[in-house]
């Protein structure tokens, strides 16, 4: 996955000026909102004509941050009900988000990876043609264990050889970490991680497993010559019990690590940071997941976090514009999200995100993979 570093804003105004303007921007006339609601109802067919709350679905990694912003919105705006935020996983959330326009469909998709081109095409096919992409911060895929664990230093190749269903095109036979690398522990491989619907799982495959697989030039060559075979060999996860799908509940993984110090868990960095009294991060290529190593991208598992907003819902769903504005007020270095554990994006990325959050610039599907 390519992490985006957006250019600084130009003549349109400084970052702080744009952010300040968000809180003083006039509210559109009620008649415009009513017209938008009527249009949205028409899109939604026979479904209910209104909804009291903004509805967001998607990533379990983004969930605690989205909840924090939702609570702040309700606190700052007594007339706006708190948005409903659901943890469905990024992939499942994309399906819900892209299912259509109308009050029966979500307004926002929280994502721990960028939208895929195939998902964008599904959206367009179902009438969701105008989508606003906003990068809200950074995160890292953390590999963690209980504080009393052996403390291994892993590489992407180690992790790939331990978790791949067909490492380097051969059947998986590794039972212990020592089978993977003689320098590692002889403890059995037991990894609790995200399900296939999770953006964290997608990032694990793209940032770690694929990188480990491509250490073999023959496997790397398959990426262009035989994509299905490449994916089968490089990104499919073993299903023999060594990797345990733990659902979209990252707190459950933390509990499992406490109960079994020999196991490893995979989840977003914020869960590692908020449970530092119980678990510790493992080094990947000699680098511990920290705020600093994710912020400067030296940690191999660093990744961006996004929200996707359905532009057709902006005027019709009460509080949606304000919710987006609350995100923008919260993602700075001294903001609510940093205090909640999110890694703040570089200034240039924040500036581009602010433009998207104020101008509601729509996503160009040609930029997606």
In which residue ranges do the predicted regions lie?
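Bacterial N-terminal signal peptides that target proteins for export
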Residues: 4-9, 14-30
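Flexible loop/hinge segments at secondary-structure junctions
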Residues: 44-369
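C-terminal motif of bacterial Sec signal peptides marking the signal peptidase cleavage site
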Residues: 39-42
